[in-house]
Amino acid sequence: MTCGPAYESVDGVRRLTNFATGEIGTILSAAFQEGGYDVVCFRGEGSTFAAPTGVGLQSFSTNDSLARALRSLPRQPDLIFHAAALCDFKIVAIEGSDSKEKISSRSGGITIHLEPAPKILPELREWFPQALIVGWKYELDGQRSDAIASGAQQLRATGSDVCVVNGKAYGEGYGILRRDLSLRHCQDKKSLALALMEILAKNEKSTSAH
């Protein structure tokens, strides 16, 4: 389980990050643990929601640190649920200051150059070929149909098995979108956890049958 925010360091005391709290990943980690699964929760250092108990915990800072942590897992997981709010952009240059420790406001204005950051979700299929891979699509703009379309695009682009769609565009609750584009609506986090455990159980049964 990945959750919470990543960050990009501007200098030794400032960061570019987001408002993710780690709540959904924490709640789902606890639910899967209660369901009998061995859970490792990778939480962004900036997570503010209380950490789950009874599960393995690893913290991460940047996109790269999460990637390294995932690749160092000692065994292949049955499921990867990637809900971490990673940085969409990385800092490639800062003009106007040479300081790495703390940029002084006395130096005047600075210009921060950003470029798109590599995504982790598209790499997960190669890293974990046998795992059920669940991504996350949080959409603010548009209607529910737009959010679902974005989720479908994610499934096609990343090779993941499931996409959980939510946000203002989707509306209340969560949508579980499968590769066949079937959609299951979950009213709350508890029903989402139960639905994901059901999907995992069916996937395990199908895999063992082969």
Mark where each language-model region is.
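A cross-family phosphate/adenosyl-ligand binding-site feature
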Residues: T2-H210
